Regions:
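Short strand-turn motif at the edge of the Rossmann-like AdoMet-binding core
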Residues: 140-146
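Conserved acidic-Pro-Pro-aromatic motif
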Residues: 132-139
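A short SAM/SAH-binding and catalytic strip from SAM-dependent methyltransferases
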Residues: 108-121
Length: 207
């Protein structure tokens, strides 16, 4: 783990996300949603992630910005839990909006539906913190479109909307500080479309 402090804007965002967890949020269309950030977004591409985990022999995972994802409940893949589907030994979670902090060194860190919720001034430090917890692999997903949710202050919940090339540039820049950690970056130009860049590490790139 790195020792960093979010910017004042970033800290305020965490407070707002905590408020949304407790009270729900207003959608862009004006309707109200009480079930906040409980979707297990990793489920959409579980097959390709499982293949990646097998290649890197992943047994321990940190779910960075886990929301309400439940790794032990059945139904992730038919009657299997995510824990069983990925054949893991241990899962740790980090979710500041729910006061969960189990950050530690693991084989792989996954981060889905998080990066676009981070204030742009904090993005580099957060990605660096993610890499610092990984021994083998980092899997990142960033949304590149406006959210259906609004923050309590009326802003769109996706506070940092950038194109895939922007995210790739940021991740490339930080990944060189962790040459032995492979990274899979998956960007979502729209909710139902994903763009996956080839998995790489700086060490492999220089071989």
């Amino acid at each position: 783990m790195t020792n960093f402090t979010l910017s004042p804007k970033g800290q305020k965002l965490v407070e707002m996300y905590t408020d949304m967890v407790d009270k729900g949020y207003k959608k862009v269309d004006g309707t109200y949603e009480a079930n906040v950030y409980n979707d297990f977004e990793l489920k959409k591409i579980r097959g390709s992630i499982k293949e990646r985990f097998k290649i890197h022999k992943i047994k321990t995972v940190l779910d960075y910005g886990c929301g309400g994802s439940d790794w032990s409940s059945s139904g992730f893949n038919e009657d299997q839990s995510a824990f069983d589907f990925f054949e893991l030994d241990r899962v740790y979670r980090y979710e500041p909006a729910r006061s969960i902090d189990e950050r530690t060194m693991v084989d792989a860190v996954i981060c889905f539906d998080v990066l676009e919720h981070i204030f742009v001034s904090d993005v580099a430090n957060v990605i660096r913190d993610i890499f610092s917890c990984a021994e083998k692999l980092v899997v990142l997903n960033g949304a590149c479109y406006p959210a259906n949710a609004t923050l309590p202050n009326g802003e769109n919940a996706h506070v940092t909307i950038r194109n895939p090339e922007w995210w790739k540039g940021v991740v490339d820049t930080i990944s060189v500080e962790f040459p032995n950690v492979s990274v899979t970056l998956i960007c979502s130009p729209t909710y139902n479309k994903m763009l996956a860049y080839p998995t790489y590490s700086d060490h492999a790139r220089q071989s």
